[in-house]
Amino acid sequence: MKPTIALVGRPNVGKSTLFNRLTRTKDALVHDLPGLTRDRHYGHGKVGSKPYLVIDTGGFEPVVDSGILHEMAKQTLQAVDEADAVVFLVDGRTGLTPQDKIIADRLRQSPRPVYLAVNKGEGGNRAVLAAEFYELALGDPYVISGAHGDGVYYLIEDILETFPEPEKEEEEAKHPVFAVIGRPNVGKSTLVNAILGEERVIAFDMAGTTRDSIHIDFEREGKPFTIIDTAGVRRRGKVDEAVEKFSVIKAMQAVEAANVAVLVLDAQQDIADQDATIAGFALEAGRALVVAVNKWDGISEERREQVKRDINRKLYFLDFAKFHFISALKERGIDGLFDSIQAAYNAAMIKMPTPKITRVLQSAIERQQPPRAGLVRPKMRYAHQGGMNPPVIVVHGNSLHAISDSYTRYLTQTFRKAFNLQGTPLRIQYNVSENPYENADDKPKKKPLRRVSLSNRIEKREGRKEEKNRFKKKTKVSVKKQFSK
């Protein structure tokens, strides 16, 4: 599993800038989906062969006891507890502040390794900038510049050095491996116990079971499944929804390890931004998705209609997923949930023949050609499969950069219907045929066209006339001389 690195520090020390540097992006979130710009930002990065996850926490105000800043501080402490390593960022220009000392005191109590990074150190004397921060007793400071990248590589390299090399990926599971994800108190633990049944009662008292994911293999109607339980499987009588915690980090880690995600919603509560955020994790990771709307038995018919309207309005980007309305406590609707998990897995792992993909593409073009972009009309020639989990279709042709988002959605729906891709995201990539001579030094130079202007023609004509006149004069002179003789 990828190590998780949390960026911590007071406001305006450059956490977001360093985050962008580590993830090599300006925004690692899922486009403009609702709810994805709040709480903690997350992103993926890689140094050499070692991948990692980065969490950009909010500005840490440890002295605030209430309000939104207090909530941000609580989220930051939770991120510290659940991360594998912590980067404590301070401002080299401002110098050491009382807030930095309070944060350092909190971080020294954490069992996670803490790396002190002095940011905004470009152009300065590293030894001088780092000197006063030794007072924090967090080891040798790393003087870096998140904006320019100075020292960032050495920092992340030292962090990842403590983690083992990623093992070669084992042969991918030939059956659904799914994770139950969702915000706190929606009934995830109840659903896990309902899925595993009465005969599978496991209590984990070992340290770390509330932080590490547990893979449990089981069978349902003769079909193999693996469930990833991030909260530990507890006895039915010990499930306490009030204290159940499922953090953003755990959701990320669970989605990374699974090939299908089961998103649990609470029908008794409104669809929240955090629901969309967690759904966005699965969508960005390209995981097949099944949505379970829990506690359906405890609401009125009027409330049910309201929930369906909210889902259509707030989770419109999950139109490919199958929705199930269940009761985990009474184990209602669980069988249908498994059918959709299996179907979503099959769709995510589908192998599509190239001839059929190209035929579907050509028929889609015949029904509706891509619109022109100025004087250019994109021309699509053929397509083939470029990957699985999620399925990727690569389209080849010319001027494909001019294809609009609406036409891409049209192609996505066409391929989804043709191959019955229910429950999985589908990605379309455009591969434009390259001109081998474009921007090449050895590009053959075009010969200039031989064009003779009107003025040149007149000059030549006048020149010929003058030449004829001179010739006539010469001949007349020579004739006179002959006659004179």
Swiss-Prot record:
The keyword Nucleotide-binding applies. Residues 435-485 are annotated as: Disordered. Residues 3-167, 176-349 form the EngA-type G domain. Residues 350-434 form the KH-like domain. GO terms for biological process: ribosome biogenesis. The keyword GTP-binding applies. It comes from the Bacteria. GTP 1 binds at residues 9-16, 56-60, 119-122. GTP 2 binds at residues 182-189, 229-233, 294-297. PROSITE patterns: G_ENGA. Residues 457-469 have a biased composition (Basic and acidic residues). GO terms for molecular function: ATP hydrolysis activity; GTP binding; ribosome binding. SUPFAM superfamilies: P-loop containing nucleoside triphosphate hydrolases. Residues 470-485 have a biased composition (Basic residues). InterPro entries: AAA+_ATPase (IPR003593), G_ENGA (IPR031166), GTP-bd (IPR006073), GTPase_Der (IPR016484), KH_dom-like (IPR032859), KH_dom-like_a/b (IPR015946), P-loop_NTPase (IPR027417), Small_GTP-bd (IPR005225). Keywords: GTP-binding, Nucleotide-binding, Repeat, Ribosome biogenesis. Belongs to the TRAFAC class TrmE-Era-EngA-EngB-Septin-like GTPase superfamily. EngA (Der) GTPase family. Associates with the 50S ribosomal subunit. GTPase that plays an essential role in the late steps of ribosome biogenesis. This is GTPase Der.
